[in-house]
Amino acid sequence: MQWTVIFENESLKHDFNRLSRRQKILLFSAYLYRQVRLIKEFDSLYSEDLSTFFTEVLGFVVLEDKEKLRNIVEVIDGRIPDTDEFSEQEGSYAQNLIIALRYLVCFLLRIDESALQKCVDMSLQNIDLINYDVDENYDEAEVVAREAKIIAVFIERAIRYAQNKVCDIDTVKNIVGSDWV
């Protein structure tokens, strides 16, 4: 699964293209945060405390705290789990999610739309892996449709919550609602 399958879909493309920068940051922060369970499972298996780091960095992203994020890309690079060392499936999930976080930070710092696409692609790899683990012959079209519906809901929520004066990690949790992975 990739960005184009979901975001080039006519039902989402128009709404997505109208989003402000702040709304996009909220949207993609929530889209990543909905997978936080995967990093928590990684932590429980490997005791790396990566979920705290993930949540902290995501909090800086939502606050658009460029000062704190300036040098964080290198720190993120150092925290990406190596699947040779962390060989269980949780290592792959955590690796994909931390790389997705890195791309989200790069988008914020450089306003690079391609970084958003890479962020989503890494996140979708986890969705693909999860579904493959459940059923090797899963219906990708069905999963894509489900992810598109979630994105549509997140777009609506991001638009609504972006009107708040201050957005933080709790705002992201509100956007996720009950749509956890």
PLM features: residue spans?
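N-terminal secretion-targeting helices of virulence/extracellular proteins
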Residues: 14-17
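Glycine-rich, aromatic-bearing surface loops/beta-hairpins
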Residues: 117-181
